Amino acid sequence: MRKIVIDMQNYLFADAVAAAFKSSDYDIEVIRAESQRDTVELCQIYEPFVLVMEVTGYAPWKLGERLRLRDEIKALCPNCKIALMVDSNTERQTAKDIRDAKKDGLIDQFFYGSMPAEYLMDQIYAM
């Protein structure tokens, strides 16, 4: 069974993603980080194939902090793909910066928070 770790401020959306995977035919287990401090430890323990992190305009979810966390995760789990999620309606500049991070090869994928959980699940599976 493949694993993903989700580190999101929006618990409702994280729960929706976890429920979507649980009720799907995909053989993927979702591990939710309760706090940002848990993320590194969970990645080290479970060695997920994808880490999904939400990015907002507020600490500790700012892009710079997420990219520092990405560096730490990649040092421990070099095969883990990094995906960032942002609300492109309220965080327009952050969304642009995340697109640039993808273009520059700093992350593997990005998602907008406005997409349905089922679509997000399909995109994660395809990674």
Per-range role (PLM):
Residues 1-4:
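Extreme N-terminal starter segment of soluble prokaryotic enzymes
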Residues 86-126:
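Output/docking surface of receiver
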Residues 50-75, 86-89:
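Conserved phosphotransfer microenvironments
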Residues 11-32:
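Two-component/phosphorelay signaling modules centered on CheY-like receiver
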Residues 7-8:
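Conserved acidic carboxylate
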